[in-house]
Amino acid sequence: MTSQSFHCPACGAPLIPRGNAAVISCPHCHTSVIVPEELREESDAAQWTTLLFDNFASNDNNWLVGNHDSEYFSPLNQVIADGRYRWEAQVSRASSISTSWLGAYRVSDFHLTVNSKHILGSKAGSSWGVIFRVQDNRNYYYFHITDSQFFAVSVTKNGQWLNPIDWKRTDAIKPNGVNQLEVIARGTNLIFLINGQIVSEIDDDYYGQGVVGVAIEGYLSGEKIIFDFLDFTLRAPRGQE
């Protein structure tokens, strides 16, 4: 076992890794904390394999691209170029969402990491995030953030929205900067991280498996919004690939 320590991002207390555990509880503030991968025993890293790393140098993974007009966004232009997956949209109807997912990767347990930047639009007028355990366009989870430093986890079931985690504020979000979202799913346990900091954890059994992707949401009719997705990494337990 490693003797190295690291610090709790919530309270700053020193923490000691525990074997190959990916997540431990801080004994001082009781926050769930992800253990840096390099401090875990090798057996933990050996349990995972990278299914996909996409830095958007090309569209080899067949993401949704092109110009689209709908009652929700008009227009919506999605382009992969110069190492980014850019979404430019004019919101036609308030509280509209647009999604794109990878149908080739259906997983149950997984570790999903995505980096993105909000380029244009008001801080609270739109959000971006990751979708996971997607069944179809009416059934999936959505972990998303705003540049006003709020995040939420939503789930749509047959088109009806529920909020397992309602909007919460967190200083983990960097306004006007690149932000990283992570989801670690093991069975019904779902852990959510922003820029390496665990912001919430739930047990939820709406969907046990599905595909993964990204999404944007616009809340203000008439507003133009732009988001750049910079990379997309999906890992799964060995043997599940």
Q: Which stretches of residues belong to each language-model region?
A:
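Short cysteine-rich clusters marking metal-coordination/redox-active sites
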Residues: C8-C11, C26-C29
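Short Cys/His-rich micro-motifs in 6-15 aa windows
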Residues: H30-R40
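Extracellular carbohydrate-recognition regions
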Residues: D44-D69, L230, E241
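Short tryptophan-centered beta-strand motifs in secreted/extracellular beta-sheet-rich domains
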Residues: F56, L112-V114, N176-R186, L190-F192
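Short carbohydrate-recognition loop motifs
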Residues: S74-S96
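Secretory/extracellular carbohydrate-interaction modules
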Residues: Q90-T156
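Short, aromatic/His-centered strand-loop micro-motif at the edge of beta-sheets
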Residues: G159-Q180
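Flexible glycan-contacting loops in extracellular carbohydrate-active proteins
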Residues: I202-D231
